[in-house]
Amino acid sequence: MENSFLSSKLVFLLAIALVLFLNTELSFLTAEGASDSNSKVYIVYLGQREHDDPELLTASHHQMLESLLQSKEDAHNSMIYSYQHGFSGFAALLTSSQAKKISEHPEVIHVIPNRILKLKTTRIWDHLGLSPIPTSFSSSSSAKAKGLLHNTSMGSEAIIGVVDSGIWPESKVFNDQGLGPIPKRWRGKCRSGEKFNATMHCNKKLIGAKYYQSGLLAMNGGKFNRIIIRDFKSNRDATGHGTHTATIAGGSFVPNASFYGLARGTVRGGAPRARIASYKACWNVVGWGGICSSADMWKAYDDAIHDQVDVLSVSIGASIPEDSERVDFIAAFHAVAKGITVVAAAGNDGSGAQTICNVAPWLLTVAATTLDRSFPTKITLGNNQTFFVSNLAESLFTGPEISTGLAFLDDDVDVKGKTILEFDSTHPSSIAGRGVVAVILAKKPDDRPAPDNSYIFTDYEIGTHILQYIRTTRSPTVRISAATTLTGQPATPKVAAFSSRGPNSVSPAILKPDIAAPGVSILAAVSPLDPGAFNGFKLHSGTSMSTPVVSGIIVLLKSLHPKWSPAAMRSALVTTAWRTSPSGEPIFAQGSNKKLADPFDYGGGLVNPEKAAKPGLVYDMGIKDYINYMCSAGYNDSSISRVLGKKTKCPIPKPSMLDINLPSITIPNLEKEVTLTRTVTNVGPIKSVYRAVIESPLGITLTVNPTILVFKSAAKRVLTFSVKAKTSHKVNSGYFFGSLTWTDGVHDVTIPVSVKTTISM
């Protein structure tokens, strides 16, 4: 039926989930203990709101549920959430037959089973050119900021929404020293709870703090089981993840921060004077870490839209292939439709192809790179042969220095009091209880190390040299020095091995990721309950970290250009990004096979905040463009109309997904030739002339018409051009990459081009 469960194709294209790393459902989180042991949590999505009165909307949700259950009391007990601000819908405990029945209601677009998923700085801003940092931090000092920071007052009127695991409010990064009044448009609030006092813990920096647990608890009989859920029944952060991401996006200045002396410097967020609103939807569960219920996440989105945040930073991910029953991206669509940029993580499932998640065209999807900083550990063998190895933050050797005997684990020797060498290819054995001091583990470059600082990780080449030394020495020894901090060359940035890669497996013509930002060994504040925290700070790695980097930059752009749409800001980032490092070195992609990074690794490139502030031209998108995407993806008129809250018809003929006005061109199946269009908006000098510069992919001829864009007046800031791609390949090919740049001599507006040839048989 048209109004019940959507077609399988539509559901698949809607499948965007809301939390990082794993999609494993937790066996202990069931509906057992509920009034009906067969009941589960479902989200009933009704589309755009029909009116602005939230009380009337909630009443209508109860009426619909009462009609289904034939009991006002049962409807009240079944209802978990009413979504009434950004969109219309509710979450409720239903049996599968009840879910099927309500899905057939003419006002229901989709019924979505609730899911439980697992949660996936000093140097950053200097590295990206967003500096200098003030030398004084008193309220009376005038911060010596320049460029984007200066022109936006460091984001003082902006509001960053962070959907995560909450906040540790006592952290110095949330001090409100020198901040003016809270923006008048703010409609949110702080909610008190366990060890969180709204009056005491919120201030002019942390202006919002809410928490959502009903969806999670409903899957466990409605109980907050302290044995299983080791968390606070409030916005207070038990895992440290939310505190870390909020710091990166908008933390205040904190000088002399470090992790055991590493990465020492001033910690601050991208928009250090922006206000932070924390929406806790993720909870610390024993054995699983941070987990989140999609019903809770929807409510966080709903409230954030109502509260009028400027950006939503959600360090999230999804399973690959994406689950056809997860349509949580709908909440993000409604946020974007209200002008809120939603910044999402590319995921940590790299470095293989087609591992990218968060692929909807309205999301700003972020990959992770290293910084021009490393933390090398010095390994000195007894023959004075020396090696330097660098690890991710989670497995740094912070000392003190050790000097021990050295042995290979596979040898029949006593390892007590020694450092041992292992290879991951030989299935490392358990060393518990054997008296081993440290382990040098030689591993594949694509493997992400476990967070254990008793391990020193290296590659096979160095491991083989160490093994040869052991084999040829009667009493081998080793000295391992604590990691040190190295910045600048030769520590040039690379796309991290764990960062998920394109191409997009759901909509191949939509390039993902959009952009890359630093996400490896990022220093930020954490909860003191975070294992290994040092004076309230810790180094973490992941696209969880690169996402708030971009969120902080977005609020600066929003402050500078308040009328820009989320799509315009994404375009500004993509078209001005670095395709080499800030120092001019090539950007490589880490993984099993090291290579030069391409658009499937980093989208447009490494984010360049200062350039993004003045992009010259932008590839803008609005609701009409998203409608064309939905039409090209197979959505029917009825479904689109309900999502938008107004009658909508797809154009005839159906739009091509190649014509979606993205700041990129991706042609997944070029047979002979194809022509597509793009539209640019002049946001630079009113009178401008841009000329096309084409770098065609191998074996592909690109032709642009016209080759010159002339902007003559403020009334004519929008121009359209066409691009014809023609292949000379005679057999099927992989993807080849190029670019299209519009230049006026000052601005270089570059979009990546990715083309794969497919020959019909």
UniProtKB/Swiss-Prot annotation:
Glycans are attached at residues 151, 197, 256, 384, 636. Residues 22-120 form a propeptide. Its EC number is 3.4.21.-. InterPro entries: Peptidase_S8/S53_dom, Peptidase_S8/S53_dom_sf, Peptidase_S8_Ser-AS, Peptidase_S8_subtilisin-rel, Peptidases_S8_3, S8pro/Inhibitor_I9, S8pro/Inhibitor_I9_sf, SBT. GO terms for biological process: proteolysis. It is found in: Secreted. Residues 1-21 form the signal peptide. GO terms for molecular function: serine-type endopeptidase activity. The keyword Secreted applies. CDD domains: PA_subtilisin_like (cd02120), Peptidases_S8_3 (cd04852). Residues 134-613 form the Peptidase S8 domain. PROSITE patterns: SUBTILASE, SUBTILASE_SER. Residues 41-119 form the Inhibitor I9 domain. Belongs to the peptidase S8 family. This is Subtilisin-like protease SBT3.15. It comes from Arabidopsis thaliana.
